[in-house]
Amino acid sequence: MNGSSRTTRGAVFGSAGLLVGVALLSGCGSGDEGGSKDSDKAGSSDSAQAQSPAEAVQATNEKTTQAETAKIAMTVTTSGGQAQGKKVTGDGVMDLQDGTSKLTLDQGPNTIEQRVVDQVLYQKLPKKAAEQLPDGKTWMKVDLGELQTRGGGNKGLNDPAGSLAYTKSLSEKNVEKLGTEKVGGTKTTHYRVRLDLAKMAKGDAAQQKKLREQLGDEVPMELWIDDKGMTRRQEIELQVQPSGAEGGKKQKVKTVVELSDFGTEVDVQPPPSGKTADMTDQAAKGAKQSS
C-alpha cells in the first residue's frame, strides 16, 4: 500500500473511539418500544429512586430517546504503544433517535468537522490530511452500514442504529450503583455496567467469537442517569487491536460522552457530493487488519 493510502486510512481510524461513543448514544429508539410515552413522561424523581439499579439502566434507553435531540460533548483518550496520551475532544449536536449528528473534533492543532447523516460518516479533514484525498476532494465519507455488513464494525458497539438498546436485557448482577454525582450541574446517579458480549452478538456465533477475541468476555461501561431517567454521561473503555506498525499490542481507548440541552435543534446536511471522496473500502480493509 502506498503512503497516500496509509495516511488516509489513518484519518479514517484516528477518530474510531469517537465513532464508538457516538454509536452508543445514537439511534437509541431501535428495538422494543415498551410502555407508553405518557407514562414515561409522568415518571418523577420518586419513581426513579424506587427502581433497582438494573431497572434504572434498562429504562434509560427509552427515556433518553424521548428527548429526541441533545447537545453532545466527547473526550476520547488513547493509551498504549505509539498512541500513548493521544486525546481527541468533540462537541456538537445529535438526533438521539436516528443518529444524525454534527461534531467539531479537536486533536491538538488539528480540527475535523464530522457529520453523520443516514448512517454515513463524513469528515472534513485538516489541510495536510485532505491533500491525500483523490481529485482535490475536501471531505471523506464512510458508509457505516456497509462497513458493518463487510465485517468492519461491531454490532452493538459501532452500529449507529443500535446504541443503548442492549442495556434492556441486563440483570441485577450486571449493574452496580456507585453513588450520586453532579454532571454539568445536574444531580445524577452513577452506575457501573458490565455488558454481556453474548447478548450483544444477538445469537451470531461468529460475531460473538470476534467480539471476545477483540474485547474479552465483558465490556465495562459507566452511566450517570438523572432523576428523570435520562443518561447525562456515559463512559466506556475498550482494549482494541490497532492496525499497522503497532502489531499485536493492544491499545486502551476510553470514551466519555456527556449529553445536555435536550430538545436542541439538529439540522445536519451531507456535504456536496462533488467535494466528497468515498473511503468505505479503505476503512473496511483497515478494520479487518485490526481485528
Where are these regions (language model features)?
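Subset-of-secretome marker
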Residues: 2-10, 29-291
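Sec-dependent N-terminal signal peptides
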Residues: 8-20
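A generic, residue-level signal for flexible/boundary positions that often mark functional hotspots
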Residues: 19-22, 253
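C-terminal motif of bacterial Sec signal peptides marking the signal peptidase cleavage site
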Residues: 24-27
